[in-house]
């Protein structure tokens, strides 16, 4: 299905992660309620997308056309110089922050009112809409709390503190470009924090002893910014997704029957690269006999 409001989705993903869930990329393209799904990454990723059978609804955007990776890498390396002591900065540390900055900076190149960000390791189980009956977009909420996210955002924008009980982190978000740009401009106006671009100020706002712990969340920050400053722009919805799907299913062999079963409880399932199916879960959750008697949520809770 496609929402009445036309917009695209961006999926920021590495070539390795694109290949890791390759058999499910078509499902991401087919099930997201968007006009096009734009995979954002390196030129190698662009080649993989071009060689795929994802069809005309899939596209590619070079990450360096949004923000050059080297700019972010060099900034983090300079900030961490007293920790690194001449050693090379692991690309993974820079990559975690970089992919979040891409999702925010995309608002400045997007030609539509909205765009969605969708995590590349997460696969929709069923159709869904990102807009309520009143035409407002949804913030989808889950349960998560990481104090350092709020420490960082409060340095960036001192009026931001935890505002709602739940979390805005739900493996995806629909962004209103106008308000994302407004937030980025507000961050860039904060003369108390070093840096010129918003992403520089974010990096300089993170406590050095926590910079290797992924201490910023683009979803938590934008959701909190909107809840505090523009509380009537978005609807709130509880989002049910299977975050630890990789412990129960192999992404390369999960079937339509499995997705139909999962969809009774969940909008989406995630296959994180650190997850693998435990031996005692093999042939258990994909067993049609068990699926006919129990829901996925009941199986997990047993």
Predicted features along the sequence, with ranges:
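Short, charged/polar "capping" segments at the starts of alpha-helices
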Residues: 19, 43-50
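Short aromatic/hydrophobic "clamp" motif used to bind/position activated sugar donors
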Residues: 115
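N-proximal low-complexity "stem/linker" segments adjacent to membrane-targeting elements
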Residues: 1-26
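Short, acidic, metal-binding catalytic loop of nucleotide-sugar glycosyltransferases
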Residues: 26-35
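Conserved donor-nucleotide/metal-binding helix-loop-beta segment in metal-dependent transferases, i.e.
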Residues: 122-157
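Long, low-complexity C-terminal extensions of enzymes
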Residues: 242-302
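Active-site-proximal specificity loops/subdomain of glycosyltransferases
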Residues: 48-108
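Catalytic core and acceptor-binding pocket of nucleotide-sugar-dependent glycosyltransferases
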Residues: 168-259
């Amino acid at each position: 299905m496609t929402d009445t409001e036309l917009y695209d989705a961006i999926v920021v993903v590495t070539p390795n992660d694109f290949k890791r869930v390759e058999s499910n990329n078509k499902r991401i393209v087919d099930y997201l309620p968007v006009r096009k799904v734009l995979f954002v990454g390196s030129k190698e990723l662009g080649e993989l997308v071009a060689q795929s059978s994802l069809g005309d609804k899939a596209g590619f955007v070079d990450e360096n056309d949004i923000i050059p990776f080297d700019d972010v890498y060099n900034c983090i390396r300079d900030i961490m110089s007293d920790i690194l002591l001449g050693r090379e900065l692991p690309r993974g540390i820079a990559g975690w922050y970089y992919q979040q900055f891409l999702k925010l900076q995309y608002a400045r190149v997007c030609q539509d009112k909205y765009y969605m960000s969708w995590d590349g390791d997460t696969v929709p189980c069923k159709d869904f809409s990102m807009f309520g009956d009143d035409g407002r977009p949804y913030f989808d909420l889950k349960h998560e709390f990481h104090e350092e996210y709020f420490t960082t955002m409060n340095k960036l924008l001192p009026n931001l503190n935890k505002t709602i009980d739940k979390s805005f982190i739900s493996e995806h978000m629909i962004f209103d470009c106008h308000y994302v740009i407004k937030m980025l401009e507000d961050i860039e106006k904060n003369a108390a924090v070093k840096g010129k671009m918003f992403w520089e100020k974010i990096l300089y706002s993170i406590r050095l002893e926590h910079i290797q712990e992924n201490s910023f969340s683009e979803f938590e920050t934008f959701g909190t910014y909107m809840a505090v400053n523009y509380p009537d722009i978005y609807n709130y919805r509880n989002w049910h997704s299977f975050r630890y799907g990789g412990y129960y299913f192999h992404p390369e062999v999960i079937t339509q029957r499995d997705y139909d079963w999962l969809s009774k409880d969940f909008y989406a399932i995630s296959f994180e690269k650190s997850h693998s199916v435990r031996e005692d879960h093999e042939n258990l959750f994909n067993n049609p006999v068990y699926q006919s008697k129990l829901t996925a949520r009941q199986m997990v809770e047993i």
